[in-house]
Amino acid sequence: MLPKNAIEKIQANVSKPCFWKSLSPGQTWKSKSMRIIPEDFVRRTRGAFEHRVVFSVRWENSWQLWLEREKNELFMIEEDWNEFVDDNHLGPNDNLFIKHDETMNLEVQIFKNNGVEIIDVPLGVEPETEPFHPTPKKPHKETTPASSFASGSGCSANGGTNGRGKQRSSDVKNPERYLLNPENPYFVQAVTKRNDVLYVSRPVVQSYRLKFGPVKSTITYLLPGEKKEEGENRIYNGKPCFSGWSVLCRRHNLNIGDSVVCELERSGGVVTAVRVHFVKKD
């Protein structure tokens, strides 16, 4: 644990609600007690979050953690918390300083017991470990599942021909027929329970050598009937993604299991829009 004077120095100029997490004897970072969000912190944020929080760290990675209440205590869901612990290789000498930013967003700083702050990806952390699956010769008859996204992704996709990247399959036959421009990058998106943002998988990014705009810059969803909706470029768990996806799913009555073809449009080599093609059920 950090010395008291170090804690006071770090908190000296902090006016927003905050709290610390560090290990006590007999605890590990995956102990249930480590998943508790202090009730005092919840009260001071005045209901800014209820169902989930988003942890953001210095190197612009973010983790979405869903919440559940047991009796009078608010817990982060075990799967989400454990992912955050594993991704950051938290150990007995680590201390978390968690500060409310806005609404559900919490800023997390990681300090060692000697007071040194971790300001870059912890050694050995690989933001995304999905393997790259080369596209098979008959992509419309074969599907090769890849490892699932991190908790909260709500995304699965497969690729097409010409070496296109591929993730979990949505079993969409001949997705290229939906494309406005056959040369554009694309992937197939399956709607799942957790669909807050639209992720672009590592295989797709690598296959097309995709580039994205700055974090929080605008991305446009192009919809049938020349309709448009806007989202933002984000990075969660080291993965590029776009906000606004859950709103789009609700507005267009997409249900869990439905699939869409996401065609990426670029300007100057940078992804600027996602053309959304609703897949007709055969």
Curated annotation (Swiss-Prot):
InterPro entries: B3_DNA-bd (IPR003340), DNA-bd_pseudobarrel_sf (IPR015300), Plant_B3_domain (IPR050655). Keywords: DNA-binding, Nucleus, Transcription, Transcription regulation. It comes from the Eukaryota. Residues 127-178 are annotated as: Disordered. It is found in: Nucleus. Residues 20-114 bind DNA. The keyword Nucleus applies. One of its GO terms (cellular component) is nucleus. This is B3 domain-containing protein At5g25475. It comes from Arabidopsis thaliana.
